[in-house]
Amino acid sequence: NMVKLIYYRNFEVDMDFKRHIAKKLNIEGIGEDELVSMLALPPNTEMGDFALPCFKFAKIFRKSPALIAEEIAKSVPADEFVSEVSAVNGYVNFKIDRDFWAKETLSRVLSEKERYGSSDEGTGKTVCIDYSSVNIAKPFHIGHLSTTVLGSSLYKLHKFLGYTPVGINHLGDYGTQFGKLISAFKRWGSREDVEKGGLRALNELYVRFHREAESNEALNDEARSYFKKIEEGDKESVALFEWFKELTLKDVSKIYKLLDVHFDSWAGESFYNDKMGPVIEELEEKGLLKESEGAKIVDLEAYGMPPCIILRSDGASLYATRDIAAALYRKQTYDFYKCLYVVAYQQNLHFKQLFKVLELMGKEWSKDLVHVAY
């Protein structure tokens, strides 16, 4: 009913009632603050709203918890707050008057307004939240919606509870696809058409490249060459890449504005280009890096997982390498209390491998990394 909807459950209201119950209890040698901390929620709400376990009192009073609970229940009278007190299996159960609870809760809602339910539990704690992670030069699609909305909700909830959230859009802005896009643009595109068409025009160029490459393998070689130029800092190639990035962010920002979604960091895959060397060095120093069929891996067989590939046989880094570098950077930069990755459940294995590799590297904080799967 409506009363049940209203009274369940506000932390501050709970604390007020716990304090009231503790004041009513007169248990020798047990202070009010300790009683407040002992009062818990019963497993079944039909039994009561708060329960006091009496097992720790058995040694003090040399009686069974059940007998102690009965004696306490008899000694505590009901009042305008507490409508019923009962003893069950060593617990003292307290039922709060529903009308009073509803009035108390509504009073707080009216006085605190939009701050109702907030707390300062997260004061001084930073929580990194990795969500949305759009791909440069590709449109924002339905697949991005879940991670974007869930991540934004977690951001707002943590902020409401006093944490300092850091919203991170880990952009997909690295890979040979950008060499393909430069090749396609230089062959069939124009600045005027792309400025006018935005992401749609870029996507059309990308699709055309793949269509043409089916019968012309030389295009893939050309794309690899352009991507290498980006990596080497070639002015023209980097300028085109940055322009594609700018057009993408301009386009997706309209969607983020509609959804009321915000980010504090847009550091994507390319941001970690110069941060992977130290990761590989550390893995080697700690004896974690092994060679397998020309590739560099971390063997996770002992943990029931396939190997985590760090470097391909051609020396190229992989997704896992960048995510290790990103986790290290985020810990160093934000000293997070938790780091949440709001990513589809299909990536479960990737995150299990990532967290395990960081643990093997001796990063005690790896336990604070959480994959929020959906």
Kindly label every feature range from the protein language model.
Residues V3-G31:
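Generic start-of-chain signal for non-secretory N-termini
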Residues Y7-F11, I30-I60, S64-Y374:
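NTP-dependent nucleotidyl-transfer catalytic core
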